[in-house]
Amino acid sequence: MISWELILALAVYNFIMYATPGPNNSILTASGIKFGFIRSIPNILGIPTGHGLQLALVCLGLGSLFIKYPILFDVLRYVGSAYILYLAYKMFGSLNISKTEDRSRPLNYYEAILFQFVNPKAWVICSTAVTLYYPKNENILVGTLFMVVMSTIVNIPSISIWAYGGSIIRQYLVMRS
């Protein structure tokens, strides 16, 4: 049986990890500024979907590969960092809030899912959460489902704040221009 103490501890951990600055929240803030909250919703929904898949893989044993072959995490870190720099260039380089025609678009649902697999912070969140909060005496499927559901429930409101904050900044910038 999963205790209320474990549920509360995992919820607090998830909130702290998802609500603090990182690649996802930077992209969501930029998306909120550039495109507004509504157009950022596919990105907001793709992040917990991708992170849930990633977390399930770690719960089901992928994390042991990182322990056995630490170079995999180094490769992931460099590839992820390069991709994050590319996205930063793309997003922040195009933060023009003009009323003229603009072909840029926010990350879509599938791009947000895939981004989780090159996001170093997301891998750290998964590895740490499974190490500290995985319910030890549960069936592997029940434990994995618990971790993924808890992650998703906390993730969506925690990251939505960043896109909403970006949309507030957008309103201010539009008023000033």
Over which residues does each language-model region extend?
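A short amphipathic helical element positioned immediately N-terminal to and/or at the very start
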Residues: 109-117
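Flexible cytoplasmic inter-helical loops of multi-pass small-molecule transporters
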Residues: 93-107
